[in-house]
């Protein structure tokens, strides 16, 4: 069976000639592959022109089947999720192709760059700008949640600007760890450590609320330029997250509104039952009202972003599989400790 769809779906895309010859349409029939945009463990992303209209360009994620062997379910899940989601702030999967060696995902091209890079480049940046960014993310994630999808890996690197335009919208990308709620209980320790919710580290069953926590972490960074949780020792980092220990340090938070701080507290609440949903967050005065300050905070935020994120251990280490393994080990230890405490009572 094709990785990217049913035989019925594949047949719809095939022409009569293709059926007669017993082959599927090839990606080269429609697209001209151009520059390499990036590479990953199992894939590369190439720029491509549409043959019929060279003015139209797309991104093509080319996945090596041999490298992917044993992880096909993960790719199928990502494709199912992307096919379900149609939102102006979510990078769209346009179509898919497959041959003997590769799977090709034709993806909407976004050209505006990463979130933090754009903020650093700006001449002016305010709480209101941060509020507008977070509102767009909340609207997209609220839509995802209504569709029964949990992203599970929301972080700044997965937030891209659609275009270089000053008023460009923000786009959510990378659904490799996303999951549909109807596909079973979620309890796997996954995601990016600095942005992961306490219940994930505690290896408890979790749901949509993990995305809200991650948005809270992103909002925190957008207002000061550094992460709410950090330690060179990963076990200490995880302990901070489990307790929800973060501060609004002076002088970095002195000019930030109380409304912004309250918003972050509501999203980064350790108690899942008390943590805001996306809909509640969208109704908070910092998002929906005029509570966000218009004072320019660009100098302090951009200075901290450059110090804490550009080529930093934070950005590099949080892509590492080794750290994810540590998360799982830590979560397992937490379960054992809780079990022993329960038995001793």
Curated annotation (Swiss-Prot):
Report residues binding ATP.
Answer: 37-45, 61
Q: Where is this region: Autoinhibitory domain?
A: 287-327
TM segment ranges: none
Cited Pfam families: Pkinase
Q: Supply the enzyme class, top level.
A: transferase
Active-site positions on this chain: 153
Q: Give me the ranges of the annotated region Disordered.
A: 1-23
Its UniProt domain note says: The autoinhibitory domain overlaps with the calmodulin binding region and interacts in the inactive folded state with the catalytic domain as a pseudosubstrate.
Name of the featured protein: Calcium/calmodulin-dependent protein kinase type 1
Q: Which organism is it from?
A: Macrobrachium nipponense
Q: What is this protein's gene name?
A: CaMKI
């Amino acid at each position: 069976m094709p990785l990217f769809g049913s035989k019925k779906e594949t047949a719809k895309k095939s022409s009569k000639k293709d059926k007669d010859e017993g082959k599927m349409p090839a990606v080269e029939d429609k697209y001209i592959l151009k520059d390499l945009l990036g590479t990953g463990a199992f894939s590369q992303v190439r720029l491509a022109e549409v043959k019929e209209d060279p003015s139209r360009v797309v991104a093509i994620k080319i996945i090596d089947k041999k490298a992917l062997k044993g992880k096909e379910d993960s790719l199928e899940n990502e494709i199912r999720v992307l096919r379900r989601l149609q939102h102006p702030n979510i990078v769209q999967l346009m179509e898919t192709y497959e041959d003997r060696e590769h799977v090709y995902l034709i993806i909407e091209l976004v050209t505006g760059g990463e979130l933090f890079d754009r903020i650093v480049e700006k001449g002016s940046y305010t709480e209101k700008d941060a509020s507008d960014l977070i509102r767009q993310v909340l609207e997209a994630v609220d839509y995802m949640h209504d569709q029964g999808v949990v992203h599970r890996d929301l972080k700044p690197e997965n937030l891209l600007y659609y275009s270089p335009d000053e008023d460009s919208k923000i786009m959510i990308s990378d659904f490799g760890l996303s999951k549909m709620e109807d596909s079973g209980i979620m309890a796997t320790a996954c995601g990016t450590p600095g942005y992961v919710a306490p219940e994930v580290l505690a290896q408890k069953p979790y749901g949509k609320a993990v995305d809200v926590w991650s948005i809270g972490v992103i909002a925190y960074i957008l207002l000061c330029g550094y992460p709410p949780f950090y330690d060179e020792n990963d076990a200490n980092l995880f302990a901070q997250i489990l307790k929800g220990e973060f501060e609004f340090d002076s002088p970095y938070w002195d000019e930030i509104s109380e409304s912004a701080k309250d918003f972050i507290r509501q999203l980064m609440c350790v108690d899942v039952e008390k943590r805001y949903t996306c809909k509640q967050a969208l109704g908070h005065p910092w998002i929906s009202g005029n509570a966000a300050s218009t004072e320019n905070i660009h100098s302090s935020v951009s200075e901290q972003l450059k110090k804490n994120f550009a080529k930093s251990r934070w950005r590099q280490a949080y892509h590492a599989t080794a750290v994810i393994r540590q998360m799982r080990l830590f979560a397992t230890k937490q379960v054992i400790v809780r079990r022993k405490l329960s038995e001793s009572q």
